[in-house]
Amino acid sequence: MAATAQGDRARDYSRSNHHKPAQSTGTAERSRAVGYMPSVEDAARSMGISVSVVEIRNPIEIEEKLSGLKPHQGVIFPPNSFIAAHRARIIELLTRFRVPGVYFARFFVSDGGLISYGIDQPDLFRQGGRYVDRILRGTNPADLPAQSPTKFELVVNLKTAKALGLEVPATLLARADEVIE
């Protein structure tokens, strides 16, 4: 999916922080990620950004779909195993086209992506381990409450930001759980 940032808030933020106005931002995904889209659309609408979907159905479409992006646009990648499996190619293309990407997991940023915000995977595994422990101690699995992730992490790659010609705001860096330099 791709979202176009033409709203006043995007322009005002850019002016106040000495950045060029965002032209668009958005998401690419292999499927609609039904649970993910309403949140993205609501947040975009509140900032005056319109959202359009770009579906990537196979590896051949990756370059075809991403090559249409321009600098000052952006892409958000929702959780998706297809995107994760092809992350090296996606990161390479976005870097070549100078388009920032926001990803769902830290490993994208470790591999050269710009920013990730997502579930803290080790914490999620610990949470699962606690469930296994309770089951092994005799708790009926049907008696265990459903749980959602409780810990999320923000990771920023400053080397990638520099390669893209972006200045990451100090407020974002201060909130980051990890900054890769």
Which residues does each predicted region cover?
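Short hydrophobic alpha-helices and adjacent helix-cap/hinge residues
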Residues: M1-E181
